[in-house]
Amino acid sequence: MIILGIDPGIAILGYGIVKYEGNKFKVIDYGAIKTSSKMATPQRLKEIYLRLDELISEYQPDAVAIEELFFNTNTTTAMVVSHARGVAVLAAAIHEKEIYEYTPLQVKQAVVGYGRAEKKQVQQMIKILLNLEQAPKPDDVADALAVAVCHAHSGHFQSLFKVK
C-alpha cells in the first residue's frame, strides 16, 4: 500500500509518501510545499493544489491521510489553513483516492506511543521507524510522514477514519 501523508498548512504543507508492505516501511518521497506570504491567498492555494496534483499523479497513492486541524486561539490562521486542507482533500478527491483523517493525538500515539509527545520525539521516531539518516525537517514534513505511518498502523480500523 502506498500512502500519501499530509500535514496541512498555507505557508508550509508537509507531505510524505511511504510504501507499507509486509509490516515494513519504505520511504518513497517527502518534502514541503512552501508558499510565500507575499502571494495572494488564491495563488497560494493554487500552488498547493498543483503540486499535490503532480505528486498524486506521479506516485498514485492508494490512500491519502491528512492530519486534522487543531487551533485554539487564532481563528484567522485556522480559516486560511482550513482552505489549504480543503485544497488537499480536493486534489485527492479529483484523483478518486481514499481520504482519511487523524487527529494530532492519534498520530503521536501511533508513532511515539504517547499522545502528548513533543515534536522532537515525533521527528526522532520517524527517523528510526523509516530508517532515515536524519530527522526530516521542517517539522511539517516529519508530521506528514507520521500521519502516513499512523494510517498504516490503523489496519482494520481504517474505515473509522475515512472522510465521508
Curated annotation (Swiss-Prot):
It is an enzyme of class 3 (hydrolase). Pfam families: RuvC. CDD domains: RuvC. Signal peptide: none annotated. One of its GO terms (molecular function) is magnesium ion binding. The active site is at D7, E67, D140. It catalyses: Endonucleolytic cleavage at a junction such as a reciprocal single-stranded crossover between two homologous DNA duplexes (Holliday junction). Its cofactor is Mg(2+). GO terms for biological process: DNA recombination; DNA repair. Mg(2+) 2 binds at E67. Its EC number is 3.1.21.10. One of its GO terms (cellular component) is cytoplasm. It is found in: Cytoplasm. Keywords: Cytoplasm, DNA damage, DNA recombination, DNA repair, DNA-binding, Endonuclease, Hydrolase, Magnesium, Metal-binding, Nuclease. Mg(2+) 1 binds at D7, D140. Binds 2 Mg(2+) ion per subunit. It comes from the Bacteria. The keyword Kinase does not apply. NCBIfam families: PRK00039.2-1, ruvC. Belongs to the RuvC family. Homodimer which binds Holliday junction (HJ) DNA. The HJ becomes 2-fold symmetrical on binding to RuvC with unstacked arms; it has a different conformation from HJ DNA in complex with RuvA. In the full resolvosome a probable DNA-RuvA(4)-RuvB(12)-RuvC(2) complex forms which resolves the HJ. The RuvA-RuvB-RuvC complex processes Holliday junction (HJ) DNA during genetic recombination and DNA repair. Endonuclease that resolves HJ intermediates. Cleaves cruciform DNA by making single-stranded nicks across the HJ at symmetrical positions within the homologous arms, yielding a 5'-phosphate and a 3'-hydroxyl group; requires a central core of homology in the junction. The consensus cleavage sequence is 5'-(A/T)TT(C/G)-3'. Cleavage occurs on the 3'-side of the TT dinucleotide at the point of strand exchange. This is Crossover junction endodeoxyribonuclease RuvC.
